[in-house]
A protein has these predicted regions:
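Acidic, low-complexity proline/glycine-rich segments
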Residues: 1-23
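A ubiquitous short alpha-helical element
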Residues: 5-8, 35-42, 92-97, 122-123
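Alpha-helical bundle segments that constitute or directly flank the non-heme di-iron/ferroxidase center
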Residues: 11-16, 30-60, 79, 125-135
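A generic alpha-helix surface/boundary motif
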Residues: 21, 51-52, 82, 105
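Short, charged/polar, low-complexity loop and linker segments
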Residues: 22-28, 111-113
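Short, flexible helix-adjacent loops and helix caps
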Residues: 27, 31, 55-63, 116, ...
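Active-site-proximal alpha-helical scaffolds that flank and shape metal-associated catalytic sites
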Residues: 65-147
Length: 147
């Protein structure tokens, strides 16, 4: 499968990301509060765009089964966004006034342009790297009893 080959060819990058001090700081709770608050705002902006892209893919789906898959994926992202809204309240982050940083803006613009202009295969391909990397983080961090 192409995705398996791409993952294998880029596994070193995924491993570097896993070892990044930011990821490790979130995992072990040592990340500075100000950095975590910034992350919450950026990730909430990202998650909203991610949910929108899934919703666009759902609307473009050729049949109800595919529609349901994308709809459920969007629902999962919205659940995660609710978690971030709770973090935002706890850390006094006003998500209504948060502006995306340059990297967040470029990535979310890419996702939304792809969603509006591409077919569902292209949309899924554009969204898959993030999902694969976060799944990798979750799997690897849980091996060390980090939820």
């Amino acid at each position: 499968m192409v995705s398996d080959e791409l993952w294998k060819d880029n596994f070193d990058l995924a491993s570097c990301c896993l070892e990044h001090p930011f990821v490790r700081g979130i995992a072990d709770g040592s990340l500075e509060g100000q950095k975590f608050a910034y992350y919450v705002g950026q990730d909430a902006f990202f998650l909203e765009s991610f949910a929108r892209a899934y919703s666009i893919a759902a609307a473009k789906s050729p049949d109800f089964s595919v529609f349901t898959t994308f709809h459920n994926l969007a629902g999962g992202v919205l659940e995660e966004l609710q978690l971030h809204q709770g973090y935002a309240r706890e850390w006094n982050v006003d998500l209504k006034v948060q502006q995306p940083g340059n990297a967040t803006r470029r990535y979310t613009d890419f996702l939304l342009v792809t969603a509006w202009s591409g077919d569902i295969g292209l949309i899924a391909s554009a969204m898959s790297p993030c999902m694969a990397l976060y799944a990798f983080f979750g799997t690897e961090l849980s091996k060390n009893c980090i939820p």
